[in-house]
């Protein structure tokens, strides 16, 4: 079985990292994702939301020695991490593969 990477993760992975509620909210924002950048180390995007300026969202994966994979995310929205903007960015990256 291959290790999950930023170019191979699935929507099920996103749900396990962020929860079904954030994924549902994020799905409505996938059309608001701009300047999406994906590489081996991180995903970065601007996501339009309720603020005048778009939020900057980012994510990277951490592969633990025990085999567990966790997502480290950040966003300039008031929530700050693991939010609907991060979910939208991750879902949009899947859509654009």
Which sequence ranges carry the predicted segments?
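Long, low-complexity, compositionally biased intrinsically disordered regions
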Residues: 1-97
